[in-house]
């Protein structure tokens, strides 16, 4: 098992927002928001720019009408 951390998520996602492709002002996004029971697991965390994170807010990507360019996954060693 590879431990989850911000740098590893960014690296997995090629340091780009999974919603718009921006490489600026990167943050982490919970696909299923934490406030709605989302976990801190690899498959629920993605790289997201600040703008898209604000737009998505407390919604799922579907609810926010935002498409992910990649599906989050657990990387291999």
Question: Which residues does each PLM region occupy?
Answer:
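Histidine-centered nuclease catalytic patch
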Residues: 16-47, 56-72
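Short, charged surface segments at domain edges that flank catalytic/cofactor-binding sites
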Residues: 1-16, 39, 74-76
